[in-house]
C-alpha cells in the first residue's frame, strides 16, 4: 500500500489474536504497522509480531523492488514491533539498525548480546538524511516504554508516532469511527503516562504535521486537530464528554436494580448514563467510560469484609492510571455490616482532585422505597 510517493505501508493484520497484551479483547483483530521510506537511501520503520515475520518480509521485499535497505529504525522495542529484528539483520547485514541507548540495551535483552554489529545510536533531536527525506528523532520516554522514540519526516510532513495515536482493530476492519477503540487503547496502554504524553504533544506542536503513521491502527490524514485535541484531553485527564459512568457488581441482583434505577433517573433528567456490569462486561470498556465522563458512580456489595473482587480490580485499574479530576458517588449494599462506600473512598485517597457528592446510598439486602428516594436525590445532585 502506498501512503505517499515514497512511503510504503508494509504492516500486517492479525485476525488470530484474542487478547492483546494478554488482557485486552480485540474482536476485530490487530494491526502491526511497519513502513518503508524509499529514497536515495531506504529506511524501514520497525518490524512486526513474530507470527507474521514471513508475510512482513515478503511485503518488505516487494516494496524494495530489488534494492537493499540502508536502515532499520526501531521506534519501540515491544515484541509486536521488534520480533523480526534478527531476521532483518540476517537478510541485510550491511543495513544499520537505528535506535537509542535504551533501544540497544533491550535488543541485547531480547536477542542476546552481539546481534547488532552495525548500529547507529541517535539522541533526541538528531537527524538522518535519506536524500529528499530527512528524519528528525524525537524521544518519547514512557509513551509507553522508556526507549520509545518517534521520527518526523520533513519532506512528507509525516510523524512516525510509535504506539501513540494507535487503536485496536485490524486495518481491514476499520470503520469511520476512530475515537472509541483509540480511547480504549489509550486508556489501557498509555493512560498512566499522561505527563509524558503532554511532553510529546508539546514537541509535536512545533512541527508541521500532515499525517500520523502509528504502529497500530490507520494512518491519520486530513484535519489532525480532532486527534490532537482528544490526546490533549486524555493525557491531561480532562473530561471528554458530559455524563455519568455507572459501574456496578451485584451478587443477587439487588445492587443491579439500584444501579439501573439511577441510570433511569439520570436519563429522565436528560443526563447521559453509561452503565457497566463489571463481572460481565469488557472491563477495559468500563475503564474507558470512567475516563471519558466527568462523573462516576460505583455500586457494589460488602464482601468478605472488603468489596466485591471485580470492583476492587476496577478501582485498581483507575488509580493505577492516575484517575483524577472527577466527581464520585457511591451505592453500597450489605446485609449486616455495609462498609463498601468507606472502603471504595479510601482507595481514592491518593488520587488528585476527586470530589464526592453528598448522597451515598446504603442498601441493606434489598432496595427499599427510602433507597429509591435517595437514588432520586443522587440523580438530582449528579445533574447539577
PLM-predicted stretches and their roles:
Residues 171-212, 216-219, 261-276, 286-384:
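FMN-binding flavodoxin-like domain, especially the glycine-rich phosphate-binding loop
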Residues 247-269:
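Short, charged N-terminal beta->alpha structural module
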Residues 2-5, 99-148, 193-199:
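Metallo-beta-lactamase
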Residues 2-60, 150-153, 157-161, 255:
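Conserved beta-strand hairpin/beta-sheet module of binuclear metal-dependent hydrolase folds
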Residues 84, 282-286:
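Short acidic active-site motifs
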Residues 40, 51-98:
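Active-site metal-binding motif and surrounding structural segment of the metallo-beta-lactamase
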Residues 36, 150-213, 221-248:
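Metal-dependent phosphodiesterase/nuclease catalytic metal-binding core
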Residues 45-47, 69-77, 97-100, 159-163, ...:
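Active-site neighborhood of phospho(di)ester-bond hydrolases with catalytic His/Asp-centered motifs
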Amino acid at each position: 500500500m502506498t501512503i505517499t510517493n515514497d512511503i510504503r505501508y508494509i504492516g500486517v493484520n492479525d485476525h488470530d489474536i484474542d487478547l492483546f497484551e494478554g488482557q485486552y479483547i480485540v474482536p476485530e483483530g490487530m494491526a502491526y504497522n511497519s513502513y518503508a521510506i524509499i529514497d536515495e537511501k531506504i529506511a524501514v520503520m520497525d518490524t512486526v509480531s513474530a507470527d507474521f515475520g514471513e508475510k512482513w518480509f515478503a511485503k518488505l521485499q516487494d516494496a524494495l523492488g530489488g534494492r537493499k535497505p540502508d536502515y532499520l529504525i526501531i521506534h519501540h522495542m515491544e515484541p509486536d514491533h521488534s520480533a523480526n529484528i534478527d531476521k532483518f539483520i540476517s537478510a541485510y547485514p550491511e543495513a544499520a539498525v537505528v535506535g537509542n541507548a535504551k533501544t540497544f540495551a533491550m535488543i541485547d535483552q531480547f536477542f542476546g548480546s552481539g546481534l547488532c554489529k552495525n548500529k547507529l545510536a541517535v539522541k533526541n533531536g538528531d537527524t538522518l538524511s535519506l536524500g529528499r527525506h530527512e528524519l528528525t528523532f524525537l524521544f518519547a520516554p514512557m509513551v509507553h516504554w522508556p526507549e520509545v522514540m518517534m521520527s518526523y519526516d520533513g519532506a512528507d510532513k509525516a510523524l512516525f508516532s510509535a504506539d501513540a495515536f494507535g487503536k485496536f482493530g485490524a486495518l481491514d476492519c476499520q470503520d469511520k469511527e476512530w475515537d472509541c477503540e483509540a480511547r480504549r487503547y489509550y486508556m489501557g496502554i498509555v493512560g498512566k503516562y499522561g505527563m509524558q504524553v503532554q511532553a510529546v504533544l508539546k514537541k509535536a506542536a512545533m512541527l508541521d504535521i500532515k499525517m500520523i503513521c502509528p504502529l497500530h491502527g490507520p494512518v491519520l490524514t486530513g484535519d489532525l486537530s480532532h486527534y490532537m485535541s482528544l490526546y490533549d484531553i486524555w493525557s491531561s485527564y480532562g473530561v471528554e464528554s458530559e455524563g455519568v459512568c455507572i459501574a456496578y457488581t451485584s451478587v443477587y441482583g439487588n445492587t443491579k436494580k439500584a444501579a439501573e434505577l439511577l441510570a433511569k433517573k439520570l436519563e429522565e433528567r436528560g443526563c447521559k448514563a453509561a452503565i457497566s456490569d463489571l463481572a460481565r462486561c469488557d472491563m477495559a470498556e468500563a475503564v474507558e467510560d470512567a475516563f471519558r465522563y466527568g462523573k462516576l458512580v460505583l455500586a457494589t456489595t460488602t464482601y468478605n469484609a472488603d468489596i466485591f473482587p471485580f470492583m476492587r480490580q476496577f478501582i485498581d485499574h483507575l488509580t493505577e492510571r492516575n484517575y483524577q479530576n472527577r466527581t464520585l458517588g457511591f451505592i453500597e449494599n450489605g446485609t449486616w455490616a455495609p462498609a463498601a462506600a468507606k472502603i471504595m473512598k479510601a482507595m481514592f485517597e491518593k488520587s488528585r482532585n476527586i470530589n464526592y457528592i453528598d448522597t451515598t446510598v446504603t442498601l441493606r439486602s434489598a432496595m427499599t422505597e427510602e433507597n429509591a428516594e435517595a437514588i432520586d436525590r443522587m440523580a438530582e445532585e449528579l445533574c447539577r
